[in-house]
Curated annotation (Swiss-Prot):
Gene behind this protein: hypA
Functional description taken from the UniProt entry: Involved in the maturation of [NiFe] hydrogenases. Required for nickel insertion into the metal center of the hydrogenase.
Binding-site list for Zn(2+): C75, C78, C111, C114
Organism listed in the record: Ignicoccus hospitalis (strain KIN4/I / DSM 18386 / JCM 14125)
Binding site for Ni(2+): H2
Top-level lineage group: Archaea
Residues that span the membrane, as ranges: none
Protein name: Hydrogenase maturation factor HypA
Family, per entry: Belongs to the HypA/HybF family.
Pfam families (alphabetical): HypA
Signal sequence range: none
One Gene Ontology MF term: zinc ion binding
Length: 139
């Protein structure tokens, strides 16, 4: 379950940012992240892990806003573009592997138009903390 490692990274990164900016008496109310579709992150599991890892910190009780970035592939040979959803039936058996190693999806894909294996992942592997919102703490 790599959702736990994502959650820990989110908490650690925001805590570092708070310390760096001298924001010691604040309560984080929202954390905004973008996660690529190819990571196959379960938003419920991620939120649960975030909730657990943020206990006792300024992030406790913060909303975790998750934007899932859709995948996009392009064939280097013919230029055709497509998404993960377009080829999901062919990749269904490999979902557990893709879940753990999203970068391997490139090795499992062929262009649906020309059948070339020269495929580039344009988007869908992101993990970005876009920002966070906070308010002054009463404590």
């Amino acid at each position: 379950m790599h959702e736990a490692s994502y959650a820990l990274t989110i908490v650690d990164t925001v805590m570092e940012a708070l310390k760096k900016e001298g924001l010691e008496n604040v309560k984080v109310t929202k954390v905004i992240i973008k996660i690529g579709e190819l990571s196959l992150v379960d938003p419920v599991a991620l939120r649960n892990a975030f909730e657990a890892y943020s206990l006792g910190s300024p992030l406790e009780g913060a909303e975790l806003e998750i934007e899932v970035v859709p995948s996009k592939f392009v064939c280097k040979r013919c230029g055709h573009e497509w998404t993960f959803k377009d080829v999901y039936p062919e990749l269904k058996a490999n979902i557990p592997v893709i879940h753990l190693y999203p970068h391997l999806v490139k090795d499992l894909l062929k262009c649906p138009k020309c059948n070339s294996s020269e495929v580039e992942i344009v988007q869908g592997t992101e993990f970005v903390i876009e920002g966070f919102e906070y308010q002054e703490s009463n404590e």
